[in-house]
C-alpha cells in the first residue's frame, strides 16, 4: 500500500488493527514492536467507535518513521495484517516540541508529563536502592553476573531464556517481537514467576539470530531484556 500524496513525516498511521485488544495492551505492544526502528515520542490509540482498529506512532526522526513504514507493512499483528501510511496531520507531541500548540494544550501536556514523572519516581522508590541502576541495565547486569559467575552458561540450543521483563509483558507482546525471526515456534511464560519467559526456535542457529538482534531490547523505556540460552 502506498501512502498516496502524504509526504514522509515523523508519525505513522496504523490501521486494520485487532479491535478486541485492550487499549493499554495495544499501546505497549506497539511500543515494543516499533521501538526497534527508532526512538518513540508517543503512541496514540483511542477506543472511540470511529477510531477503533487504528493507532498513531510518533518517532523522533523521519528516518525511523520511514523504516517502520517499510518494515511493518502487512505485518501480522494480533492475527491481522497491519496497514501503514504516514499520518496526515502533525501529532500533539511534535506540535508541542516546535511550539505550535495552544497554551492550554501545552499546559495539559506538561501536567501529564509531571504526573508521569512523579509516578515513576514513586515506583523507583518502592523498588529499592538498586532500581535506578537497574533502569539503565547496569545494575541488573551486574547482579546477574554475580549470580551466574559460579556456574557456566548453558550451551547454545534452540530455547532462549528471557529475563528482566516488565510486569505488564504478555506472551503476545513477546510473540510479536520474536516471530520476526525465522524458525520461531512459541513463547512460554510462567504465571508464578513474572519477569521471565522462554522462547523456542526450531534450531540453535535461529535462536542465536534472535538473541543477537534483541539482546538489550527495551519493551518499555526502562527494561532492557537479558537473553541467554535456557538450561536443559
From Swiss-Prot:
Residues 127-151 have a biased composition (Polar residues). Keywords: Cytoplasm, mRNA processing, mRNA splicing, Nucleus, Repeat, Ribonucleoprotein, RNA-binding, Spliceosome. GO terms for molecular function: RNA binding. The keyword Ion transport does not apply. CDD domains: RRM1_U1A_like (cd12246), RRM2_U1A_like (cd12247). Residues 92-159 are annotated as: Disordered. GO terms for biological process: mRNA processing; RNA splicing. InterPro entries: Nucleotide-bd_a/b_plait_sf (IPR012677), RBD_domain_sf (IPR035979), RRM_dom (IPR000504). It is found in: Nucleus, Cajal body; Nucleus, Nucleoplasm; Cytoplasm. Signal peptide: none annotated. SMART domains: RRM. Residues 108-123 have a biased composition (Basic and acidic residues). The keyword NAD does not apply. PROSITE patterns: RRM. GO terms for cellular component: Cajal body; cytoplasm; nucleoplasm; spliceosomal complex; U2 snRNP. Component of the spliceosome where it is associated with snRNP U2. Involved in nuclear pre-mRNA splicing. Belongs to the RRM U1 A/B'' family. This is U2 small nuclear ribonucleoprotein B''. It comes from Oryza sativa subsp. indica.
Amino acid at each position: 500500500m502506498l501512502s498516496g500524496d502524504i509526504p514522509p513525516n515523523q508519525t505513522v498511521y496504523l490501521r486494520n488493527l485487532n479491535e478486541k485488544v485492550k487499549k493499554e495492551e495495544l499501546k505497549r505492544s506497539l511500543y515494543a514492536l516499533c521501538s526497534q526502528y527508532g526512538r518513540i515520542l508517543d503512541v496514540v490509540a483511542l477506543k472511540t467507535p470511529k477510531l477503533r482498529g487504528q493507532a498513531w506512532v510518533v518517532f523522533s526522526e523521519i528516518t525511523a518513521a520511514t523504516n517502520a513504514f517499510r518494515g511493518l507493512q502487512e505485518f501480522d499483528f494480533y492475527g491481522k495484517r497491519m496497514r501503514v501510511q504516514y499520518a496526515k496531520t502533525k501529532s500533539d507531541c511534535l506540535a508541542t516540541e516546535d511550539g505550535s500548540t495552544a497554551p492550554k494544550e501545552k499546559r495539559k501536556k506538561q501536567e501529564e508529563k509531571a504526573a508521569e514523572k512523579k509516578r515513576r519516581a514513586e515506583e523507583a522508590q518502592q523498588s529499592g536502592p538498586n532500581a535506578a541502576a537497574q533502569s539503565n541495565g547496569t545494575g541488573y547486569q551486574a547482579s546477574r553476573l554475580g549470580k551466574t559467575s559460579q556456574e557456566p552458561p548453558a550451551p547454545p540450543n534452540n530455547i532462549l531464556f528471557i529475563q528482566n521483563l516488565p510486569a505488564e509483558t504478555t506472551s503476545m507482546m513477546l510473540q510479536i517481537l520474536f516471530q520476526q525471526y525465522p524458525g520461531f515456534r512459541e513463547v512460554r511464560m510462567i504465571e508464578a514467576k513474572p519477569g521471565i519467559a522462554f522462547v523456542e526456535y526450531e534450531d540453535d542457529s535461529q535462536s542465536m539470530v534472535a538473541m543477537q538482534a534483541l539482546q538489550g531490547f527495551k519493551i518499555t523505556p526502562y527494561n532492557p531484556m537479558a537473553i541467554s540460552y535456557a538450561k536443559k
